[in-house]
């Protein structure tokens, strides 16, 4: 998700992703929650009011997370393990809890049927018994149409942690190797089929897809008493407007949308299907469409479409995000040196926190601009910009034949 520093703290309807996860866990009746984090986010996690444990080596993945909580477990404890990056409705938690209560399986794993290839773990099944796990088998090599969703109920977690230690490996699938070894040794590992909502949050466009889901939960307009709405402003549809927000003359908010605390939507501005974080300013004549803006973002005569802007981002007048290729093909983004398709023909830019972008900057579809960067005016951004960069340049015309004419 770079340049967004921690996707667990992306906000949807004013709450971080991890807060939404905790709410769903509680609604399903789970009481004791342990959050496993790294040195980079322990402080933020501790503010959530639950026990926080540090995983020293994040490269150990879920295996490391399980080992990190070992000293907090007692012999009769059961553990529900989930990934904060996989969002599921509360029904998923209730389903696995209910199934586990009458199952003699040592491990229960949520499983979801997919209709197209997903680059994750696939399970081989015999009835409800899982007979194997294949990580990223490649399209056409899937052992079934069921994928492993990281919502796992461990009935004997201390025994499984012992298995993890026996299977020590430098591979990033250490946890899955331990499950495979458990299956090989005769443990009953049960698949729990799930048909409800699920959204992995791996790439930036996944966050926008999840935002759309949260917007679908807004049933009616919710406007705080202290919000100031000009008589000539237009509010349409399912919109949440928080305390202290100001919607000025001739501004339009088209839902579903979320306007955070103390936000200013200035004259003639348009916000549609977007989240605007607290204390942000959508300045005069700006348009924000299908985007997620962090806290304290400042716009002035800008177009931001299908984009994610981190906290404390500022756009100078005339800076715009391009979100649609002229050839109408799916937008691609560079991720760790590889071009990854967004699977959509509308996707704009991702800008890291505390970045300032000058006047008349054009961000091409799929652009990434790192955190704490300065982009001077008038440039075209068509490549990945690392964190803490200063970007200045001139544009040069390159003319060649249009082979798609």
Where are these regions (language model features)?
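Residues at the starts of beta-strands that form the adenosine-phosphate
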Residues: 31-33, 78, 106, 188
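Long, charged amphipathic helices and adjacent flexible linkers at domain junctions
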Residues: 214-232
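Short, hydrophobic beta-strand segments that form beta-sheet elements in well-ordered domains
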Residues: 32-38, 108-111, 234
